[in-house]
């Protein structure tokens, strides 16, 4: 009780946020409870420090582009077919999921606390991947999903986090316990990828890991050996399993693979929606209903819930206005951190870039990641934590 009673408000906020990101995939309800507690505590923290609250410069910059994005998305919520659907979905998708970013940015400044939050989440994510592996090898399912949500949710997190793990392991800025947790998670992801069988996570990780490792492996030859050995081991392991070779080769199958054909069909339908509603789309939260009634092609027999692509989905749902807003917001984060990274070569700006690029723009080519509640909040968690580590 003595230790608990000595914890400050900042520590309690950090605990609640960390519990939220660790539990949000296991139990959405539990994750929401800790999320609400964190937000309420942060409101009290901000009020308590209202006369001397430190607001990082990046918060001021990103708040402007975030407000612009909301302004450009709003017409798709209120000026389309059904405001009773559009406005609540606007609040849920575009407002409710970002507070984790501002909570961390405004309330958590202690570097050790931030590192500990990362380490705890990485350990949790490793267990998440082992669960996905067990689900597959035990015969419970063909494709493991880990703690919860869809099979592609954990795949998107793999694509985002694996390159970040590599940066943490290669950069001296991170303490040993964070490196150990990243190494644990990276090893578990190998099992998770085996159980999850996401072609996207295999392909994108093989592309992104060498790219983000390049600034480090150019400095020390031993890093070249380590990265090549790790990639070689993974490739060799998968190549010895004929079923995985066949699944990987199916990435380019555009004639008989049902998953690929379904995506092509739904992309065509979403583009047709955009052609009919180019400015504001069919309306936030109304894509699937209108898709089923008016746009689903006869050959698309999976009755997909979304377009399996962030940007094609946005074209159909929010039109050019909404897509422009989203590109401005996330693009500003990437450009800002790239400029800082070029000047400072710090790992935190690099990891912040990786989080947004990999989750929104890379895996977002094969999945509608922006609408995944747990995934997008974990991305904002990673983004804010890295930026706070850089600024403190």
Predicted regions and their residues:
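A membrane-periplasm/extracellular boundary helix in multi-pass inner-membrane enzymes
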Residues: 191, 195, 213-256, 268-276, ...
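Long extracytoplasmic/lumenal interhelical loops at the membrane interface
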Residues: 254-268, 276, 280-318
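Selective detector of the "anchor" transmembrane alpha-helix that sits immediately C-terminal
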Residues: 317-336
